[in-house]
Amino acid sequence: MGAVARALHRQNGWLRQNIELEAQSIASLSAGQLRARMTRYNAALLAAVDANASVLDTLYGPPPSWSWPTLTLPWQSTDRNVDIYNGLGSVWRHLAKDWSAEGHSGMRDLNARLTSMISDELRSNAPSSSPTVLLPGCGTGRLAWEVACALPEASVIGTDVSEAQLGVARHMLACTEPGSLTVHPWLDESRNNATDQSRLAALAVPDVAPGAAPANLSLQLVQPGAARLVPASAAAQQMDVVCTCFFLDCLPDTLAAVRAVRHARG
């Protein structure tokens, strides 16, 4: 997790440097009213970046002192998808989508439908008394947690190749207080913002308290190899149900991978 923390903090530092460079351009504006407005906006952006840095400290720990900041990102991977999902913007936006009230309102119906389909599948195939459900590409863990809550008799395994996403998932699942963190998910995205305030938008996470869930839930979060659904140590454990969302582009042959881990009657 140290390498991930270092990379994410560096990306946040790079964003801060870019905003500071914008401040230098603002200072050269001749129009006093516009300059004052842009100066206030720039200061608000810097404050939000610093607030996000504090959230990174909470999620991943502080960066080593020698790593702050640099314009060269150290996170190098041979897997394109790992690069994407370990990125700072991806971490913030997945966190907002899955664990804020505003984001989850758009996912609630989909997650409920997937959970219902899993339940129906388990009933119709009459698996063992302790069925196993695999959720590859689980990201920040919201769907995996909801499935585990809805099916306490099942063993739920969420996997993701991104250590950054799993770091968020583990922290969210341990939270016992809703709204314990506030994030600004769109600071690095200056496009598609109709107003100054939309880029500065702050969202409270999580919207629920997963850490207060019943202790009898069986939920594991694991990191497989980049081309696998499950770690090699768990490959022999075939699954009764494989359920995934936003994952079809992450494996060379998704169907073959699903067949390899699916139970014969699953």
Regions found by a protein language model. Name each.
Residues 1-125, 173-196:
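N-terminal accessory regions of S-adenosyl-L-methionine
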Residues 169-170:
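Conserved SAM-binding loop
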